[in-house]
Structures are given as structure tokens and as C-alpha cells.
Amino acid sequence: MKLHELTLMEVKRGLEQGDFSSEELVTSVYDRIEETEDHIKAYITLTKEQALAQSKEIDSQRAKGEELGPLAGIPVAIKDNICTKDVTTSCASKILEDFVPPYNATVISKLAEAGAIIVGKTNMDEFAMGSSTENSAFFVTSNPWDTERVPGGSSGGSAASVASAQVPLALGSDTGGSIRQPASFCGVVGMKPTYGRVSRYGLVAFASSLDQIGPLSKNVEDTALALDIISGHDHMDSTSVDLEVPNHTDFLNQDIDELTIGIPKEYYELVDNDVKSLVESSLQSIEPEAGNYRQVSLPTTEHALSAYYLIAPAEASSNLARFDGVRYGQRFATDDLKTMYNQTRKEGFGNEVKQRVMLGTYALSAGYYDALYLKALKVRSLIKQEFEQVFSECDVLIAPTTPTVPFREGENVDDPLTMYKNDICTAPVNLAGLPSISIPCGFSNGLPVGLQVIGKAFDEGKVIQVAHKIEQMLQVFKNAPQQGLDNQGGK
């Protein structure tokens, strides 16, 4: 097996045992990126020179017997809306095309302390607004399983990079499903932690009450390790919760026979038959090891998407007001201040961003605040209450991650409602602030399908426990079809 094909834990063990050096590993990763990037287009920015220099330094420290962090010498990709000091953070937008942050996001500082090496910044939907990574201002990222299809979004670059074996670990952000949906589409594992578990400091905000940073990796074990690294209270983030963080890897390999697993019926009614069949088949496969299955109902789910697409754009319209050409980012050259504001935003923002900002501004306007935004907040409260009620009876919920398999590039570009429906199974979890992980559960016509395990607030451990057991029992990749990427020279 080539170095770039190894999982995060395999890489970690190999480095610690001296089977290969960090420089060899990082070189292998960049060779793989060079080999596949023309077909995938996962990266906006690569940091090869810095990464190789860092790998040599870590190899030197390891040779001297110095104490190193848990991710020392391991390459990681970062979604391009997470601030990286001295490395461009564009949010896949023209308005921030040349923006270089003067500081690191807290999660980047935590990765640095752990010894991780950043190999580049991944493509995304502009300002994380989208479900296909087609809204990037620069280029469209492709799905490694079929390069004519989308990888999902908005963290499509991160998911595609892990799926195509460019890196063992990537970070993304999840506002309404932006880690889990691309994880499902690309056949990788993606986790949205509880709101407040991972610091948002340094994440360029889309919707501040919904955004959460999380990992994407090749398996649940790797995700648990990554979550251990990036979790924890941060005084720089007022929404960060000061709770002790458990060792999430301790929950691996634990039995689930005493747990009650809820099956939310509404989620299964909202998805295509092939997706539904695969998730239900997975439930049957793990039944001998599982505890009790309980059919549960979350009736407000049918209104969740409407509430989400009022609350998120409303918050975005406020957050994106800071991009005005005055302090940072692109600026339209003119002597008139009003013209500068208007033209900077007109030329700097893409159509989807403008559309959502306008929708959010409308929802917050005096005549519609009560009828739209306030009502959406009430629906959000109902969704939270329903989850609380269900979790008084269940330990976790298992549901489909996405309603469909990956769709073709361009198929839904002119149909925003169909595009927005991709979030129907994921957005309610963000509205409730709960943890959820998407794991592969099979293939439909050669395309990956994911299921998600949803847990109680700050109970990521149980989510990982159940997801790992499912992963072990399904062994999805034992008889997996060949990636379309492999037929295009990306072997």
C-alpha cells in the first residue's frame, strides 16, 4: 500500500515506529495531489514549500528523541473558510481572493500544537453557501467516484481530497449539513460536533448560531482522534462551552447491545428509495449486535428546511455586511463611498451569496420580521423540544444523511429548491445544535450512500461508539466499486 493510501492512525503508527519519515509521507501526498488534482480540483491553495520544510523539522526532532504531538508530521487539508496565518483564506469568493489572515483559527493552533502539517486550503461553495461546491468563484470540484458528479457541499473540496486519497484528514465546517452531506456523497466519514464543542474562533462566519467545525477522514477511528485534538473550551469564542472533553477514542470497540436506537420515521419518508433501502439494510445487518430499535417521530422535520433557510440567510446578511472593501478583501476603485460599497459587493459576491443575503435581509425587514424570522425561531424551538423528547427514550438516532446519491454537475444549478432539499436530513440537527456523524453504508449504481448517527448534546462519544460498530459490521469497502477517478489516470 502506498503512503497516501494509509489511514490517519496507520500513518501515525508508521511515523512513530520509523517505518517512513514525515518528509516521505508529505512528498507522497503532494505526488498524489499532482496526479489527481486535474480531475478533482480539490484545492484553492497549496502550501508545499512550507509543508516540506515543516516535515523535515519534525523528522529532525523525532530523530533527536524530542517529545512530539499526537499528529506530528501528518498532513491535513483545511477548508478555505478557516483562517490560517500567512496563508490565503478566500472562502472561495472573489471578494476575499487575496485575503491573508494575520492570525490562526483556534482549530489551526490546536492542529499546530499536535504537530500536524497543513498541505493546503480546499475548495468550497462560496462562504459555505451551497450543497455541491459548484458555487465556488474559482472552479467546480468533482466527485472521485464519478468525476461528472458533484462531491456535495459546502465542504466538497475537503471530502473529495480525503476520498481520492490525497490526505488522510481534512477539516470542514457544517452549517446545515456541509460536512455530512459531502461525506455521504464522497464515501468518507464526516462529523459535526455539538454546537460549542469546537471553537469557531477564526471560522469565517456564515450563520453564527449554526456553524460548527469538524473533521472528515477515512474511518470512524480517525475521526475520533481528530475530534480529540480540535475539541475544547476557548475563551476567544463566546459560544464555546466549558465542559471536560472525553477521550473519544475510548468509545471505539464498545458494544452497543444495551443502547436504544431511535429510527425517526420522517427522515425515511424524505429520501429516494435506493437510499432508504441501503440505510434500512444497514439497520438489519447490525441488528444482532444492536440493542433495542424504537420507531420515533419528529413531526416538525417537515418545517425544518423552511426555518433553516430563513434563519441562516438572516444571520448571513448580518455577517457578510462586514465585507465592504474598506478593511480587507477586494475593493472597487472609485472616489464615491456609496459606489465603492455597492460595486465591491456586486463584483465580489457570487449569485448564490447575493441571493441568500437578499433573502435574509427580506426576512429581517420590518414588515416581515414577525411573519418570517420570528416564526422560524419558534419552529427551531419546537425542533429542539422534539429532539429532547425523543432522546429521553433513545440513546442515538440513525437516519439517512442525504435524500439522493450524488447528482451530476450542473443538474440542479438553476433549481435552488431542489438544491436546498439536499439539507433536509441534516439541517434539523444544526437547528438543534446536536452532534452527528455520517458514515458510508453502501453503494447505489457505483455511487456512495451515507447514514448518520445523531446523538444528544455533548454525547459525541456514544455517536462514535455506534458509528464504529456499524462501520465494523458493514465493511462497506471490502467489495466497493472502482472510483471513476481510477479510470482517468488517478490510480
Swiss-Prot record:
Gene3D superfamilies: Amidase signature (AS) domain. Transmembrane segments: none annotated. Its EC number is 6.3.5.7. Allows the formation of correctly charged Gln-tRNA(Gln) through the transamidation of misacylated Glu-tRNA(Gln) in organisms which lack glutaminyl-tRNA synthetase. The reaction takes place in the presence of glutamine and ATP through an activated gamma-phospho-Glu-tRNA(Gln). It comes from the Bacteria. The active site is at 79 (charge relay system), 154 (charge relay system), 178 (acyl-ester intermediate). It comes from Natranaerobius thermophilus (strain ATCC BAA-1301 / DSM 18059 / JW/NM-WN-LF). It catalyses: L-glutamyl-tRNA(Gln) + L-glutamine + ATP + H2O = L-glutaminyl-tRNA(Gln) + L-glutamate + ADP + phosphate + H(+). One of its GO terms (molecular function) is glutaminyl-tRNA synthase (glutamine-hydrolyzing) activity. The keyword Transferase does not apply. Keywords: ATP-binding, Ligase, Nucleotide-binding, Protein biosynthesis. It is an enzyme of class 6 (ligase). This is Glutamyl-tRNA(Gln) amidotransferase subunit A. InterPro entries: Amidase, Amidase_CS, Amidase_dom, AS_sf, GatA. SUPFAM superfamilies: Amidase signature (AS) enzymes. Heterotrimer of A, B and C subunits. One of its GO terms (cellular component) is glutamyl-tRNA(Gln) amidotransferase complex. The keyword Ribonucleoprotein does not apply. Belongs to the amidase family. GatA subfamily. One of its GO terms (biological process) is translation.
